[in-house]
Amino acid sequence: MSFKVAIPARYASTRLPGKPLLMLGGKPMIQHVHERALACGAEEVVIATDDTRISDVAEGFGARVVLTDAHHESGSDRIAEVATELGWRDDDIVVNLQGDEPLTPPDILHQVAEALERHTDAAMATLCTPIETVEQMLDPNVVKVVRDAADYALYFSRAPIPWDRNVGRDVTHRSLEGCHRHIGLYAYRVGFLKAFAAMSPCALELTERLEQLRALHAGARIQCPVASQVPGQGVDVSSDVERVEKLLRA
C-alpha cells in the first residue's frame, strides 16, 4: 500500500523547549523519529516545523522539511498545511507521527495506515493498547478510548472510562478488562484532514484538550484497532530523556 508520513515538530514546547533537538544517544531526537518513519515503508516522509533551528538540523541529516505557519493549534493543522503545500491528493493517506516519539515501532505506522485503507467508511484511524494498571486508568495524562464491536472509537477521555458502576469510586478493585489507552498516532485521508483543519474546535475538544473529539463531534468515524506492538516511551518532560536513552541503547 501507499502512504505518507508527516512529522510535526515544534521548538516552543511548554514543558520542554527545544525538545526535537534534544540529543539522545548522540543524535537529535527528531532524527531518531525520522529514521523510524523511513523504516515503515512510507513512500514519502516529511518533517513539518515552524522553526529554522529544527529545519536546519533536519536538512543536515537529509530529511525533507516544510516550514509551516507558527500559529497552528495542533499537529493535524500543521500537516494539513503541508498537504496543501506539497499538492497531495485528497485520497492520499498520511500518518501523523509526533516528533517526540523516538521509540515508535515502524510496524505500527504501517498498521495505522493499513487500518484506514481497509475501512473506507473511516475518516481517520488511530491505535490503542490495553490498560494494565489502575494507576494508568486514573492518570489524566493517559487518554482512554471506548470502542464499538467493529473497533470504531465511541469516545476519548482523560477520565477513567468506561466507569465501573459496580465499584463506584473504589476504583482500586475495578476490573480493567476492555479498558484501553489511546496511542497518539493518526492516519487521515488528506481530503478529510483539510476539512478537519478548517473546522472550529468543539466544546468537548476544548474541555478535554483532545483534538480527535473534533472529528467525532463532526460525525466522522475513527477506526481504532489494538496496536500490533506496544509503542515505546515518548519524551514529554526532562525526566523522560534518561529513560529513553537507556531504551535506545538496549
Swiss-Prot record:
It is found in: Cytoplasm. GO terms for cellular component: cytosol. GO terms for molecular function: 3-deoxy-manno-octulosonate cytidylyltransferase activity. Activates KDO (a required 8-carbon sugar) for incorporation into bacterial lipopolysaccharide in Gram-negative bacteria. Belongs to the KdsB family. It catalyses: 3-deoxy-alpha-D-manno-oct-2-ulosonate + CTP = CMP-3-deoxy-beta-D-manno-octulosonate + diphosphate. It is an enzyme of class 2 (transferase). PANTHER family: 3-DEOXY-MANNO-OCTULOSONATE CYTIDYLYLTRANSFERASE, 3-DEOXY-MANNO-OCTULOSONATE CYTIDYLYLTRANSFERASE, MITOCHONDRIAL. The lineage of its organism: Bacteria, Pseudomonadati, Pseudomonadota, Gammaproteobacteria, Chromatiales. Keywords: Cytoplasm, Lipopolysaccharide biosynthesis, Nucleotidyltransferase, Transferase. It comes from Thioalkalivibrio sulfidiphilus (strain HL-EbGR7). GO terms for biological process: CMP-keto-3-deoxy-D-manno-octulosonic acid biosynthetic process; lipopolysaccharide biosynthetic process. Its EC number is 2.7.7.38. Pfam families: CTP_transf_3. It comes from the Bacteria. Its main location: cytoplasm. InterPro entries: Cytidylyl_trans, KdsB, Nucleotide-diphossugar_trans. Pathway: Nucleotide-sugar biosynthesis; CMP-3-deoxy-D-manno-octulosonate biosynthesis; CMP-3-deoxy-D-manno-octulosonate from 3-deoxy-D-manno-octulosonate and CTP: step 1/1; Bacterial outer membrane biogenesis; lipopolysaccharide biosynthesis. This is 3-deoxy-manno-octulosonate cytidylyltransferase.
